[in-house]
Amino acid sequence: MAETMFAEHWAGEGFPCEAGSGETIVVITGDGGLPTRAHELLAARRRVIVFALTADDGTAREAARRIGAAVAALGVERFDVMGEGAGAAAAMWLAAAAEAEIGSVVLAAPDGVPDEAFGEIKRSALVLSGTKDQSAAGDRWRTLLPDCHFMLVYDAGPAIGAERPEAVAFIALEFFERRDLFLVSRENGVVFP
């Protein structure tokens, strides 16, 4: 597979990286890093816009507001959202925004304690946790979210997207495309045990 090139764009308050075409996935990472192999794999089938949070971004709620404005400035009206690590809270605040037209939410190795307000969100969500992740964060998020699916990614710790990019991309795409039916996969997942 050819390497996907992410382009950096000025979108008001943020500098997201973007690649791919088609339906949009907005990814919010909590590590301030560049797009990963998992993002490249997502961009092979969808348009992917990656926002990397840093310590200077303020609260998750403030970051979500800025990201929502940046996504709107890029002309995106409807999208799915993926929050990774500390980016999970910003992803959920974005999903909670009344003006956001979001399909589904994937939280990959969510970090921290979720806000109780997230329990009111009626959007379909998937929490991915690695089997080597010793934190209870995934369980906390899964328990709070009312329409939440939970899936373990084998042989992965908290850096789930870096450690198992193919598995994360495969599962996320299945969920975004099939939502509640994604567990009945159209493809054999044996390559991602």
Model-predicted regions and their roles:
Residues 40, 126-156:
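Conserved loop-alpha-helix segment in the C-terminal half of the alpha/beta-hydrolase fold
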Residues 1-13:
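N-terminal cap/lid segment of alpha/beta-hydrolase-fold proteins
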Residues 52-56, 111, 156:
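Short beta-to-alpha linker loops that shape the active-site pocket of alpha/beta-hydrolase fold enzymes
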Residues 15-57:
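Conserved HGGG/HGGXW glycine-rich cap/lid loop of the alpha/beta-hydrolase fold
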Residues 62-79:
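Conserved acidic catalytic loop of the alpha/beta-hydrolase fold
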Residues 148-149, 154-193:
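Catalytic active-site module of serine/aspartate enzymes centered on a nucleophile-bearing elbow/loop
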Residues 78-113:
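Conserved hydrolase catalytic core segment
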Residues 110-117, 123, 132-136:
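Active-site nucleophile elbow and catalytic-triad environment of alpha/beta-hydrolase enzymes
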